[in-house]
Structures are given as C-alpha cells and as structure tokens.
Amino acid sequence: MVKVIDIGRVVVKVLGREAGRKAVVVDVVDENYVLITGPKTLTGVKRRRVNINHIEPTDKKVEIKRGASDEEVIKAVEAAGLVEYMRERVKPKMLGLTKAEVK
C-alpha cells in the first residue's frame, strides 16, 4: 500500500512516545523520512524528522508552504477549522502488529 504523504497532510503518529497524537507534514526529507510538527503548543508534537512507517496519513490536509514555521502551521490549521480535530488523541492502529512485536 502506498501512503499519500505530502506537504500539509495531517498524520497520526502510530509509534513512539507521541503515539496517537496528530501532526502536520512540513517537508519531505527523502523516500523514508518526513519533517512533521504538531505544533507542540497545539498537539504536543515537537518539530522532528520521522520515519514514514511511524505515521499514518489522514484524509485532512492544510494549505502550507514547504518548511512552514509553527506559527504558519497554526494559522493554516485555524483557517481550515481543524483546531479541535488536531487536539483529539486517537488510539493508533498498530498496522497489524501485536504489542509484543513492537519494540
């Protein structure tokens, strides 16, 4: 399955300490990594590089430019009316893995 991960796409982190939190893709680093931000003041996700296998894209997208600052991302999320959606935490789908298989 090919994931549609482009700039401005809202994603859910499925692995790591921020699992279940939503973030926005700010830049595509290469075929395996993207740069995401919550921003931290909105969702608790700091700007960081993550493996695309650790995120799951949603059907939501905000209009931002490549490398947008946290302030620009917040304005775009507010303009799209997604503030409450971004603050919601979800139970991440573990992509078919059992808890014992996740290390």
Curated annotation (Swiss-Prot):
Which Gene Ontology terms cover its molecular function? RNA binding; structural constituent of ribosome
Q: Can you quote a single GO CC term?
A: cytosolic large ribosomal subunit
Key word Ribosomal protein present: yes
GO terms (BP aspect): ribosomal large subunit biogenesis; translation
List UniProt keywords, sorted A-Z.
Answer: Ribonucleoprotein, Ribosomal protein
Q: Name the InterPro entries on file.
A: Rib_uL2_dom2 (IPR014722), Ribosomal_eL14 (IPR039660), Ribosomal_eL14_arc (IPR023651), Ribosomal_eL14_KOW (IPR041985), Translation_prot_SH3-like_sf (IPR008991)
- Record HAMAP family: Ribosomal_eL14 (MF_00721)
* Similarity field: Belongs to the eukaryotic ribosomal protein eL14 family.
Q: Which PANTHER family match?
A: 60S RIBOSOMAL PROTEIN L14, LARGE RIBOSOMAL SUBUNIT PROTEIN EL14
Q: What is this protein called?
A: Large ribosomal subunit protein eL14
Query: What is the source species?
Result: Pyrobaculum arsenaticum (strain DSM 13514 / JCM 11321 / PZ6)
Question: What gene name is given for the protein in this entry?
Answer: rpl14e
